[in-house]
Amino acid sequence: MDITELLAFTVKNNASDLHLSAGLPPMIRVDGDIHRINVPAIEAKEMSDLVYSTMNDHQRRDFEAELEVDFSYNVPGLARFRVNAYHQDRGTGAAFRVIPNEIWTLEDLQAPTVFRDIIDVPRGLILVTGPTGSGKSTTLAAMVDHLNKNVAGHILTIEDPIEFVHNSKKCLINQREVKKDTLSFNAALRSALREDPDIILVGELRDVETVRLALTAAETGHVVFGTLHTSSAAKTIDRVIDVFPGEEKEMVRSMLSESLRAVVAQTLMKKVGGGRVAAHEIMIATPAIRNLIREDKVAQMYSAIQTGQNVGMSTLDQSLSELVRRGLVAKPEARRKAVDKKAFA
């Protein structure tokens, strides 16, 4: 069995992911659900060869040393894929996330119009959050593409691995891959401040040093995009502050209250008629929100977001209501993800 055939089948069926696991048939995820491909199970030796065929020597060495590895894999004329290879009890496994060759625009994504206002700023931290598979990378790529078409600046991305490939339009774009073009997010961010960027995208805010450097970059006149695996704006603020030791928390609250521009927490919903669409909680850093961050009153954020629709804010439930009203999402699907399930009875 050839990996290119499996990946072509994945793309042809509009799947978001291909899952390979020794001892089982390949499976694909379509509109959020896993489906088996109607082929025989792949045994351990064949699976190992299949997964290894997608790696270069450096990636194979990492896989053998660390027992898992992340990398990108390109099939010319088909798509790019973000790959995580790992070991499991039956042998080798791998997850291939499809990254389309064409970057979707904010219009393609039916993104709220406030997204353009959020990113049209001279400086500040913009966080796009949500669980794995919620479309964070796709949303960020659309935001970066919008800036690339409309701003004459320098965009620098730091990713692990590089997902969407951006061609320079109005902007100069440089994309750096961790372990290939730089040793770590930290090293790349430290260096970034000397590379004259206007916009910096940090693939993931994984640790205290990366968060610290991202906040500093946002404070010193850069637009900084970052992602976290948090499900709401309030949890995002808590997560950012909680990575710091106790004695630094007050200072970080102050820094974050000054530099934050917005938090977009998104989740993917099954669309009526097939496909998926994102629902968003959107928190804009208004003076009231900045005060709540500074004074450690995160619990009051939800009501501030609820009443902030006039400036483009939206709770998840408000976003779900709008998707239901527009006929994009069915009520039972909205109820499944809603905070107040009774509202979608």
Specify the residue positions occupied by each region the protein language model found.
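Short, flexible helix-loop junctions that flank or precede catalytic/ligand sites
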Residues: M1-A345
